Amino acid sequence: MKKGLLTMAGVLLTVSLVSAGTTVPVLAEEETTLVYGSGDYTRINPAMDEHGEINILIFNGLTAHDGDNQVVPGLAESWDFDDETNTYTFHMAEDAKWQDGEPVTAEDVKFTIEAIMDPENGSENAPNYEDVEEINVIDDHTVAFKLEDKNVAFLDYMTMAVLPKHLLEGEDMQTSDFFRNPVGTGPYKIESWDEGQAITLVKNEDYFKGEPSIDKVVFKIVPDDNAKALQLKSGELDLALLTPKDAAAFADDEAYTCYDMKTSDYRGIMFNFGNEYWQKNRDLIPAVCYGLDRQAIIDAVLLGQGMPAYGPLQRNIYNYEDVEHYDYNPEKAKEILEAAGCEMGDDGFYYRDGEKVGFVISVSAGDQVRIDMAQIAAQELKEIGMDVSVEIPAQTDWAGQMAFLIGWGSPFDADDHTYKVFGTDKGANYSGYSNADVDKYLTEARQSADPEV
């Protein structure tokens, strides 16, 4: 079962952040506004959803990450760890306040993590806190977490945004109106939300870590990648994350600054193993792997700014290099199909037990990189005799799809990605992948600080 899941059409990305007008001086008395080209939001709910760009501006966790991805204080000024009892004790800043003026307390922390852990709430982040055995409020500004076992990523997970108990207790954690008008502790607070157009944040003058230097940050909703580049060029945006193709137009323009960053972010085809087709044809997945020319996809879509990926942790110290590499080999792909009993039809496609061999790749609308990758992958697989097509559904339906062009990568410790994406029945395991050996290794890895484990 393991083969084929982690290696499908895998490519690691280099992303380009482009900003405009960086050399224009601003008078001290003028209001400063930064307009960022953002994807759309239906809610701002850090506890239930994956990390969002806007979350860290509105909320704080007990811990935070610095520019080198190291854990630093957030709402907690310090913390202790008792190795004998596996207990973390966090000592919180006493001057932190909610944006409605109420003090932030240890009860808020306990409320937030318990809400995430509650299976009734269906949080994607629940696997991160499976090891929490007890949460004890020592006093208003001290909270202790007793773990069942070691979890080397626990301090990373405490970057989770703390939510206000006094506003959310008794509310539905998925549908509450709070998540359309959130109140946080962070450097910015919501000024307005024009649905489908923009979310405007204004600085929090009472922020406990100091007043921000930029007065307003506008998340302008521009879901289409090409449109972001056009609006950056026209001056409608100050900052945008662009595809390599779109960023190339700004590289030699002195009016813009381009930041190219190597990432652990990857794109790949993930199969829905709950789908009847893959339950019958799982043995054909290696043929898909050999039928994909990853380097050709990188050159065409990313202008060479990437590398073939053969696992989810390739640019991570936890990467294991000796995995099987399904390098491009169309002839071997055909051999696998024929060995499985597939026969070539008059239309140029293989058939198995009278059924055409092929599947549909679903892709999110507006993400041109994924769309382009999926279309090239589909064409490459057609060339080896698999009838593969691409669809762009209006809404994501994980259970109803055969396969999807995914984008993932751990923002900090590898556990944050692998445990909940590939662990059986975990919060972000949309593929339905299940392997008892993998579950065992994932559990062992989160309990060890040794990168070799």
PLM region spans:
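N-terminal lobe/hinge region of extracytoplasmic solute-binding protein
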Residues: 37-81, 114, 183
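Gly/Pro-rich hinge or "lid" segments in bacterial periplasmic/extracellular proteins
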Residues: 66, 70, 159-212, 216, ...
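Aromatic- and charge-enriched surface segment that lines or borders ligand/interaction sites
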Residues: 77-122, 144, 278
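Surface-exposed binding/hinge segments that line
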Residues: 80, 126-168
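Ligand-site clamp/hinge motif
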Residues: 204-250, 378, 387-389
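Append "and occasionally in soluble cytosolic enzymes with long acidic Gly/Pro-rich linkers
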Residues: 280-376
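Ligand/substrate-recognition segments at binding pockets and active sites
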Residues: 343-411, 451-452
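Extracytoplasmic/peripheral linker and loop segments enriched in polar/acidic and small residues
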Residues: 389-397, 419-453
